Amino acid sequence: MSIINTAVQPFKTEAFHNGKFVTVTDETLKGHWSVLIFMPAAFTFNCPTEIEDAAENYAEFQKLGAEVYIVTTDTHFSHKVWHETSPAVGKAKFPLVGDPTHTLTNAFGVHIPEAGLALRGTFIINPEGVIKTAEIHSNEIARDVSETLRKCMIINEKIRPII
């Protein structure tokens, strides 16, 4: 069953953002476009490259009214250390969301139960909290965040009133 055009299920978790721990909920995702980028775990091979890519494109996401959220099955404490020790991850100005209970990874269909990790998944959610795009692939395949930005631009164009 597809999750496209379904509402994000209720959740509450913690994130590391702008040097502090913050709570992130399904309500946090409302009122603006949200891009959830799921990664297997902190300190894994491709993740810093993808986070750096997202950081380099972050201003463009913000121009579209979108917030980026990186999600792994680690805790927000792990994300703090990751942010402080990895030059690439340290560029992130967006929340690094912990999902140690696998609430989000299960809700979005990216949980790998036998490993306790997430598949690489990217989801664009509208300001009402409805999932508009979903892309999931094997953890061996790194993503190009500029492609996600392109999708956000297309969605943004389609919803803007024509003047």
Where are these regions (language model features)?
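Chalcogenol-based redox active-site neighborhoods
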Residues: 1-163
